[in-house]
Amino acid sequence: MEIALGPLENGGAMTIRGGGEETAGCSQAAPTAGLGDGSQEPAPRGRGCSARRGAEPGERPLPPQPPELPQSRRSPLEEEEGEGDPGLSVAEEQTLGAGALHHQRVLINISGLRFETQLGTLAQFPNTLLGDPAKRLRYFDPLRNEYFFDRNRPSFDGILYYYQSGGRLRRPVNVSLDVFADEIRFYQLGDEAMERFREDEGFIKDEEKPLPRNEFQRQVWLIFEYPESSGSARAIAIVSVLVILISIITFCLETLPEFKDERELLRHPPVPHQPPAAPALGANGSGAVAPASGSTVAPLLPRTLADPFFIVETTCVIWFTFELLVRFFACPSKAEFSRNIMNIIDIVAIFPYFITLGTELAEQQPGGGGGGQNGQQAMSLAILRVIRLVRVFRIFKLSRHSKGLQILGKTLQASMRELGLLIFFLFIGVILFSSAVYFAEADNQGTHFSSIPDAFWWAVVTMTTVGYGDMRPITVGGKIVGSLCAIAGVLTIALPVPVIVSNFNYFYHRETDHEEQAALKEEPGSQSRGTSLDAGGQRKASWSKASLCKAGGSLETADSVRRGSCLLEKYNLKAKSNVDLRRSLYALCLDTSRETDL
């Protein structure tokens, strides 16, 4: 008669035979432990054990013990406690120890495609979905002894490689960017992995925008700098856009002939004709012309203030100046504010008004309109016209409130190399074809090309396929040169266009992606609160309200989810240290699953 007893504390086994012989601490044949993959591993022998021996004198014989019952396969709820993986018995776990358990294999089913890896591989990243036993428990199928995920199969090659390589994330070539990014979010690889993935794919990392430390300055800065931050910020943005549009419309209307003539008459009214004054003798007897009693100097400044265009311009400049000063005093960094191109445009948009106003005031000074200063006045008028032209740059102020203009500006900035190559190719073509058409038309008396520099204009409008027709070749040789010039221009312009379009698409999708992420963060119950996205993009609740009882692909009932959720929420703290409670919850899930199948 032979009775096999359970394992001893030193790792060996004990067998009691009917003949009075016993083997303590080990058996003749080393016991084997079944692994999760079906292989066998010899258990370590006890310390100081021999093959078979009788009871020595003075040694206390062991009392008889009941035979060891066969251990059933453990539930995943016991495994999630950190004591083993589904499919590993208690005796096997005690025999193998933590080191062997670390190398146990786990089966992952991705939409019918099975992957096999080790628990230690997944445990490298415990904060992820697959690395955290509590998170991946929701997807365990106890009947098939595997984890099932209804996700994109090709993407899991890159996800599994992330665990196997220790953190290197590589997107499979047959998976699109948005699909793989969605898988990264589902498996909860973290923000750091997402940022590395975006950098590897060529995405530019967005710099964090600083905010003022003072609460009042922060609120003012958000209102005037970020129109989407609040309702008041949107109202300020609408007012700013309206003022910009009014300023641009006024700038265009004041150049119409009817308005221009009226303004000139208002600013410089005609002086009534006065008869010539009689010469009078001065104190020294010299003749001098006495001023007429009725002649007066036209009050230019009051008449300028009465101009409706000047009033509208003054109102717009007051708003622009107020907005610029408020943003300057509320900005977090004065140096960064001064280097910002948009703020430079704001300054350029308002300083022509003050220069014009200063010129008007200078004309009011005595002797400001003397005849000896006609040349200086003409030069000042030319400079003033150029300064007034700068007002047209106010249209770029709209880019502060327009995402489309911002995308266009970023596209041009990113395509400066391609634009430089385009200008360089055009420059070469202009030199080449202007020289060729000049020599081709040199013998013709009626030619339009008197010199090579005169032919530059023709070469530019021909290569850009504009063709004004003011200058054209007459001879056969000149027409051949013109045809080659047009073909070369089309090819030169068409070559860098795809790169520019690609940059535009990149910045456009980047902006839309930012808007989607911002909307995702604003939604209640986002991933920061423990939720995730399933394959269809729908929200999945936290694990206490998720699928607790999926068995054999059957759908759990609402009652089973409710019962399991209540139990887990009620005993959540105890369940982490009470294996019996988790075992009872697992039995509850199996019972509800069987009821659903029936």
UniProtKB/Swiss-Prot annotation:
<keyword id="KW-1003">Cell membrane</keyword>
<dbReference type="GO" id="GO:0060081">
    <property type="term" value="P:membrane hyperpolarization"/>
</dbReference>
<keyword id="KW-0630">Potassium</keyword>
<feature type="transmembrane region" description="Helical; Name=Segment S2">
    <location>
        <begin position="309"/>
        <end position="330"/>
    </location>
</feature>
<dbReference type="InterPro" id="IPR003972">
    <property type="entry name" value="K_chnl_volt-dep_Kv1"/>
</dbReference>
<dbReference type="GO" id="GO:0051393">
    <property type="term" value="F:alpha-actinin binding"/>
</dbReference>
<keyword id="KW-0406">Ion transport</keyword>
<dbReference type="GO" id="GO:0051260">
    <property type="term" value="P:protein homooligomerization"/>
</dbReference>
<feature type="transmembrane region" description="Helical; Name=Segment S3">
    <location>
        <begin position="342"/>
        <end position="362"/>
    </location>
</feature>
<dbReference type="InterPro" id="IPR011333">
    <property type="entry name" value="SKP1/BTB/POZ_sf"/>
</dbReference>
<comment type="subunit">
    <text>Homotetramer and heterotetramer of potassium channel proteins. Interacts with DLG1, which enhances channel currents. Forms a ternary complex with DLG1 and CAV3. Interacts with KCNAB1. Interacts with UBE2I. Interacts with XIRP2; the interaction is required for normal action potential configuration in the heart.</text>
</comment>
<feature type="topological domain" description="Cytoplasmic">
    <location>
        <begin position="1"/>
        <end position="231"/>
    </location>
</feature>
<dbReference type="GO" id="GO:0005249">
    <property type="term" value="F:voltage-gated potassium channel activity"/>
</dbReference>
<dbReference type="GO" id="GO:0043266">
    <property type="term" value="P:regulation of potassium ion transport"/>
</dbReference>
<feature type="intramembrane region" description="Helical; Name=Pore helix">
    <location>
        <begin position="453"/>
        <end position="464"/>
    </location>
</feature>
<keyword id="KW-0832">Ubl conjugation</keyword>
<dbReference type="GO" id="GO:0097110">
    <property type="term" value="F:scaffold protein binding"/>
</dbReference>
<feature type="topological domain" description="Cytoplasmic">
    <location>
        <begin position="402"/>
        <end position="416"/>
    </location>
</feature>
<keyword id="KW-0633">Potassium transport</keyword>
<feature type="transmembrane region" description="Helical; Name=Segment S5">
    <location>
        <begin position="417"/>
        <end position="438"/>
    </location>
</feature>
<dbReference type="GO" id="GO:0005886">
    <property type="term" value="C:plasma membrane"/>
</dbReference>
<dbReference type="GO" id="GO:0086090">
    <property type="term" value="F:voltage-gated potassium channel activity involved in SA node cell action potential repolarization"/>
</dbReference>
<dbReference type="InterPro" id="IPR000210">
    <property type="entry name" value="BTB/POZ_dom"/>
</dbReference>
<feature type="topological domain" description="Extracellular">
    <location>
        <begin position="439"/>
        <end position="452"/>
    </location>
</feature>
<feature type="cross-link" description="Glycyl lysine isopeptide (Lys-Gly) (interchain with G-Cter in SUMO)">
    <location>
        <position position="205"/>
    </location>
</feature>
<feature type="short sequence motif" description="PDZ-binding">
    <location>
        <begin position="596"/>
        <end position="598"/>
    </location>
</feature>
<feature type="region of interest" description="Disordered">
    <location>
        <begin position="517"/>
        <end position="539"/>
    </location>
</feature>
<keyword id="KW-0472">Membrane</keyword>
<feature type="transmembrane region" description="Helical; Voltage-sensor; Name=Segment S4">
    <location>
        <begin position="381"/>
        <end position="401"/>
    </location>
</feature>
<protein>
    <recommendedName>
        <fullName>Potassium voltage-gated channel subfamily A member 5</fullName>
    </recommendedName>
</protein>
<dbReference type="GO" id="GO:0086087">
    <property type="term" value="F:voltage-gated potassium channel activity involved in bundle of His cell action potential repolarization"/>
</dbReference>
<dbReference type="InterPro" id="IPR005821">
    <property type="entry name" value="Ion_trans_dom"/>
</dbReference>
<feature type="lipid moiety-binding region" description="S-palmitoyl cysteine">
    <location>
        <position position="331"/>
    </location>
</feature>
<feature type="region of interest" description="Tetramerization domain">
    <location>
        <begin position="1"/>
        <end position="195"/>
    </location>
</feature>
<dbReference type="GO" id="GO:0014704">
    <property type="term" value="C:intercalated disc"/>
</dbReference>
<keyword id="KW-0449">Lipoprotein</keyword>
<dbReference type="GO" id="GO:0034705">
    <property type="term" value="C:potassium channel complex"/>
</dbReference>
<feature type="topological domain" description="Extracellular">
    <location>
        <begin position="254"/>
        <end position="308"/>
    </location>
</feature>
<dbReference type="GO" id="GO:0007219">
    <property type="term" value="P:Notch signaling pathway"/>
</dbReference>
<feature type="short sequence motif" description="Selectivity filter">
    <location>
        <begin position="465"/>
        <end position="470"/>
    </location>
</feature>
<dbReference type="InterPro" id="IPR028325">
    <property type="entry name" value="VG_K_chnl"/>
</dbReference>
<feature type="transmembrane region" description="Helical; Name=Segment S1">
    <location>
        <begin position="232"/>
        <end position="253"/>
    </location>
</feature>
